[in-house]
Amino acid sequence: MNRRDFIKNTAIASAASVAGLSVPSSMLGAQEEDWKWDKAVCRFCGTGCGIMIARKDGKIVATKGDPAAPVNRGLNCIKGYFNAKIMYGEDRLVMPLLRMNEKGEFDKKGKFQQVSWQRAFDEMEKQFKKAYNELGVTGIGIFGSGQYTIQEGYAALKLAKAGFRTNNIDPNARHCMASAVVGFMQTFGVDEPSGCYDDIELTDTIITWGANMAEMHPILWSRVSDRKLSNLDKVKVVNLSTFSNRTSNIADIEIIFKPNTDLAIWNYIAREIVYNHPEAMDMKFIKDHCVFATGYADIGYGMRNNPNHPKFKESEKDTVEKENVITLDDEEATSLSYLGVKAGDKFEMKHQGVADKNWEISFDEFKKGLAPYTLEYTARVAKGDDNESLEDFKKKLQELANLYIEKNRKVVSFWTMGFNQHTRGSWVNEQAYMVHFLLGKQAKPGSGAFSLTGQPSACGTAREVGTFSHRLPADMVVANPKHREISEKIWKVPAKTINPKPGSPYLNIMRDLEDGKIKFAWVQVNNPWQNTANANHWIAAAREMDNFIVVSDCYPGISAKVADLILPSAMIYEKWGAYGNAERRTQHWKQQVLPVGAAMSDTWQILEFAKRFKLKEVWKEQKVDNKLTLPSVLEEAKAMGYSEDDTLFDVLFANKEAKSFNPNDAIAKGFDNTDVKGDERKIQGSDGKEFTGYGFFVQKYLWEEYRKFGLGHGHDLADFDTYHKVRGLRWPVVNGKETQWRFNTKFDYYAKKAAPNSDFAFYGDFNKMLTNGDLIAPKDEKEHSIKNKAKIFFRPFMKAPERPSKEYPFWLATGRVLEHWHSGTMTMRVPELYRAVPEALCYMSEKDGEKLGLNQGDLVWVESRRGKVKARVDMRGRNKPPVGLVYVPWFDENVYINKVTLDATCPLSKQTDFKKCAVKIYKA
């Protein structure tokens, strides 16, 4: 057996043993004669594994890794092997459910009763129009998803922004990737990684920062393990985390740091380079391709800026007060000393509204900012394990810096939620690029800072499609008039249709519901009431306020339980779709089986709802706020050949171009397409009649229209048919060729086009006009271009707004486990995965357990200023926190940990920090 086969078999077996189960032989590739196999994509994380799925008698009967898939090469993790079983849980939603009273009328306090699709859409239309007519375009909201198919996300975006003229659509990817997006946009001027997974096999060094890859990206971790075992002496692995986890098992160095101090560690590495190893700097790379930059530090923490908000409990207020002002301790005052502050000073957050503003600084200013981050200071601030000596911790920091600095050593830095879910998440993303740029180790085979995506299409749908409240497809934004013009032309809607004011980000949609500013919300492909911090507020907002909540889901999760209307959604292999993964690889699949019960795809739900709105209801004059009124575009629409009585379905989704897509396309031969042709279930549609399909290839139309946004400016995608013939392609796809390393003129068509005589070109055009300044502020208003250059940011170390205290002495971090996906809505229905990990545990150190008089398995209360939950203690498990920190995963609705967490965010990205709040632990 060769090494790779050994790794593969060991990974499968270890994944199964972790879950406490044996892998069925059918899931390891045994093939039945009457099974029909086809390629598809795994439903779970952002790795983007290819799978083969088998269908028989109208059901998915087996899945296995796809040997032809370049991402996973035939291997799946334990969740991947159970893709089939997620679809057939006993409580699968099969009919719409509406809260009603005994008279059959909608009643917010009523019980759920089954209704027809027509009755469901009638009530949904009524409640939407009530909120829309009362509050306008800001009165409604859509909780979107990084698990939408690309076509679903595109349809939702188009309906919201071109149809309803609202920007209040935001994906749960705001919770997972928004800080990475800001890091990319601020640094490169364009989103998504420069490298690819091939870097793993080419690098000498893998350094993980807040990324427990062994459990969260296990297939990529198998490739890392393979690389490590291929050259034990040369290849080094370092795991940086706030607690010990399985990623440390093959690590040469494990660094346990105090929450938030990753900011200080990055600056220490940069200081080592600049002050002690200037010869390691790639001065030509820096001079030719980079500028130095910074921004304001006094930007708050993304909390409400009114601690006296009527919905706050008294216990919450002392934390929320820090949104406006903090008192500096010695450590934070040292890091901010360039601002002229000292310990004990009140530090006011004066620049909350311009958190993303940045300007160019000199190298000398950059060097000045790094001055405090000596080894002594950084070790004292960052050491996270009380059992480790300061000297040992210092040695590890030095070894870490040396690995980066070593001249010919290739280095890849990976990170995920430990970086992104962070009140300074955008900053710490920028810091990773800072170090790689200083050394010239970015956008090169085997070297680069690489943000790993959490969800299967957080890149492909949330980011590339632009289902964020401020975005449009292909990195365009609603605030840019040129971008709106491009979008309106592609969508064939009148000029000035699109609302130029960004909408509410995900968490703010919740706050708007609580404040009565939004009275209609539609949840699609996610579970916001379980996945949003400080959940007690949002449960009350859903159940006690005058609003109407619609949840499209496949199982009754917490969000469905607090909803007013539940719509049963088709699951992944019951529809056509596409996902985009973390290495920019786009992959498509075909519908394999019919949906269960009366479930229908989210695309169908979006299009059917669009039928209920005439242009005159939505394209009329609309007041956004006291400063902005959207003009009526009905006359312009008439000039384009539309009638004011046309529906949004007619104009946006069933137009002449759409109808040209042949429903009998050769690519679809032999496969169902419920949206296009209906199916044998004879579903009674939203009009009460049998739904027989749209009569045109709607998924192909949506894809081909969507790809127009990216063609010609670095976001090129291939045509629909091509993706069904390959195992994905990494964009930009130019002349049929994918791109492995962006910005490198040897590999990237657009880099070569931008700078034909150079080796690199950072050609993104976002925020490439800068003013000059120093570490404190910009010094002039005159802007200059930094075309084709990237930014090396200085960002200071700052602490979390809520930290352990005498009353709440523990840090709380949340996250995932290998066996379950997100809120557990799907994986908790798989018997094998449920038996393996039936509940979320509170992982804590044995020393803390002894101090509290706890035994293994005891039930405890985990309580913060916001709420409390019961959980069972695990002091001997896979995760080993240091003294003073506990880890509780969030997949278990019976351990509703987001009742405890703090809704603080990165002020730039608006991404919640789920990794840091203060709690007390006591026996239940």
Swiss-Prot record:
Mo-bis(molybdopterin guanine dinucleotide) binds at residues 79, 147, 172, 176, 209-216, 417, 421, 527, 552-553, 575, 602, 814-823, 898, 915. This is Periplasmic nitrate reductase. The keyword Repeat does not apply. Its EC number is 1.9.6.1. It comes from Campylobacter jejuni subsp. jejuni serotype O:2 (strain ATCC 700819 / NCTC 11168). Predicted to be exported by the Tat system. The position of the signal peptide cleavage has not been experimentally proven. Component of the periplasmic nitrate reductase NapAB complex composed of NapA and NapB. PANTHER family: PERIPLASMIC NITRATE REDUCTASE, RESPIRATORY NITRATE REDUCTASE. Binds 1 [4Fe-4S] cluster.
